[in-house]
């Protein structure tokens, strides 16, 4: 009898231990985000098309606002809701603030030694602080007002000189405008760098939008050697560095008092002053210069291009905007930057374009630096994080008739593009939000107001406005696939 009691006692103890272990195991089990069925080796690559923001949006409708994809074996979190974006860029901003290492970005952007692609840390903080102080602060942006005035006036005059029956390529005009302004602000002179630099810039931006399978499936890295991508990256990277070397040599030869101090002068002065305490290598200066030039050129160009396309496609909206701008400019010689703040409808058009056609449909990739729980899902450290800005901006739960171009919606709401409202995030938010939004919008709004004030627009070749091709081109920054060709008729007094 005693032996039987001992047997039962031991059995109960063993059962209790087993139950506790099972309960502990269940409570510690991770809950990953929803994920589609993946294929061996390639993961979910087969589900991603050339316009990745559209592919992600389609998948999110099935798998939810937060989903886990695998590019090869690498985990990639795709966030497609305002709530998820808020977690990433506000509530848990610090652990989502770094950048992943991607080979094409490393080669062309100086291994993350600038601002945009730098890992989160002291270097990034120092570099960002310098860019803000010397180029992107409200005070500095205001100081470039003369440059914006001269360059926008030059664009208007160039369009005016074209014959009324001659088609104007607005896409080319906008590229030249943004190049001219940013070159003068960063480099001090419009011609510094030259046309060769502009061509290199276009190639770099195109390559940044390309995909390197070797980043995610290392043993398939040979594919980019076969298809020529590696060779093209190396060729363009070498040309870019040569151009940057030329710029630095030129500015180091400058005599004191030769010209007004600009961004490059400031960087070189900082390098000289810190050489004995905390030396700054040339690659850091090159990276900062290229960050500012590339970020300030392509995004503003894309925004102007989409704006004029939507306005031409929607003539009533164009007429409403023209009426406002022309009323403000009545009995004046033209539009100035001070006039822009008197134009609420123009401000609404600006916001609606950044909602409907954000230049960065997918915000720059982030990397999670520690394990996290977000919206009830467990996400491991090292996961690449993509915020689908395009999906958020067209979310029908946030926006009425989200596919419709309707600036009036912003006359009825306080939602803005400055990163405080997560319903639209054209410039991102939080620590890694774009520091150049003030610079970009100052040029965008002045150029737009002058264009609609000075000209009436229509399509050439008898094309109807409603048939205007609005197809997107694949790329790092989302442009129209075809250039915007119009007839511009000078306004009748």
From Swiss-Prot:
Presence of keyword Iron: yes
Pathway in which this enzyme or protein is active: Secondary metabolite biosynthesis; terpenoid biosynthesis
Carbohydrate-modified residues: 169
EC number annotated for this UniProt entry: 1.14.14.143
Phenotype upon loss of function: Co-suppression of menthofuran synthase leads to a decrease of pulegone level and an increase of piperitone and piperitenone levels due to an increased pulegone reductase activity.
Entry's transmembrane regions: 2-19
Lumenal side: 20-493
Cross-referenced InterPro entries: Cyt_P450 (IPR001128), Cyt_P450_CS (IPR017972), Cyt_P450_E_grp-I (IPR002401), Cyt_P450_sf (IPR036396)
Catalytic activity annotation: (R)-pulegone + reduced [NADPH--hemoprotein reductase] + O2 = (R)-menthofuran + oxidized [NADPH--hemoprotein reductase] + 2 H2O + H(+)
Highest taxon of source: Eukaryota
Record has Mitochondrion as a keyword: no
Keywords assigned: Glycoprotein, Heme, Iron, Membrane, Metal-binding, Monooxygenase, Oxidoreductase, Signal-anchor, Transmembrane, Transmembrane helix
Bilayer topology: Single-pass type II membrane protein
Protein name: (+)-menthofuran synthase
């Amino acid at each position: 009898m005693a032996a039987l009691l001992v047997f039962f006692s031991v059995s109960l103890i063993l059962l209790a231990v087993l139950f506790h272990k099972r309960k502990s195991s269940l409570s510690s089990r991770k809950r990953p985000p929803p994920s589609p069925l993946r294929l061996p080796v390639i993961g979910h690559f087969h589900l991603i098309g050339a316009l990745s923001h559209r592919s992600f949006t389609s998948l999110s409708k099935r798998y939810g606002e937060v989903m886990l994809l695998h590019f090869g074996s690498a985990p990639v979190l795709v966030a497609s809701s305002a709530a998820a974006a808020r977690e990433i860029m506000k509530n848990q901003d610090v652990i989502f603030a770094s950048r992943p290492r991607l080979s094409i970005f490393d080669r062309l952007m100086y291994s993350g030694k600038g601002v945009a692609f730098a890992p989160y840390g002291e270097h990034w903080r120092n570099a960002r602080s310098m860019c803000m102080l010397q180029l992107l602060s409200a005070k500095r942006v205001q100081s470039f007002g003369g440059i914006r005035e001269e360059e926008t006036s030059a664009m208007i005059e160039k369009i005016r000189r074209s014959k009324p029956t001659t088609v104007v390529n607005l896409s080319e005009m906008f590229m030249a405008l943004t190049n001219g302004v940013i070159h003068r602000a960063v480099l001090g002179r419009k011609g510094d760098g030259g046309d060769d630099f502009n061509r290199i810039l276009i190639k770099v931006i195109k390559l940044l939008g390309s995909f390197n399978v070797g980043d995610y499936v290392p043993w398939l890295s040979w594919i980019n050697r076969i298809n020529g991508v590696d060779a093209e990256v190396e060729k363009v990277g070498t040309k870019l560095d040569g151009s940057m070397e030329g710029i630095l040599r030129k500015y180091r030869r400058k005599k004191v008092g030769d010209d007004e101090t600009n961004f490059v002068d400031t960087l070189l002065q900082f390098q000289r002053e810190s050489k004995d305490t905390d030396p700054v290598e040339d690659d850091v200066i090159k990276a900062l210069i290229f960050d500012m030039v590339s970020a300030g050129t392509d995004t503003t160009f894309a925004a102007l291009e989409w704006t004029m396309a939507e306005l031409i496609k929607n003539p009533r909206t164009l007429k409403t905007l023209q009426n406002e701008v022309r009323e403000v400019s009545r009995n004046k010689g033209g539009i100035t930057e001070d006039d822009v703040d008197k134009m609420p409808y123009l401000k609404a058009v600006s916001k609606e374009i950044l909602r409907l056609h954000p230049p960065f449909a997918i915000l720059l990739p982030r990397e999670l630096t520690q394990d996290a729980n977000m919206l009830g899902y467990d996400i491991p450290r090292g996961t690449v994080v993509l915020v689908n800005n395009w999906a958020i901006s067209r979310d029908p739960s946030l926006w009425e008739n989200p596919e419709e171009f309707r600036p009036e919606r912003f006359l009825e709401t306080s939602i803005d593009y400055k990163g405080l409202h997560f319903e639209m995030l054209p410039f991102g938010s939080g620590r890694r939000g774009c520091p150049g939004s003030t610079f970009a919008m100052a040029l965008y709004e002045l150029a737009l107001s002058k264009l609609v004030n000075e000209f009436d627009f229509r399509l050439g070749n008898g094309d109807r406005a409603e048939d205007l091709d609005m197809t997107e081109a694949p790329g790092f920054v989302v442009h129209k696939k075809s250039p915007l060709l119009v007839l511009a008729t000078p306004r009748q007094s």
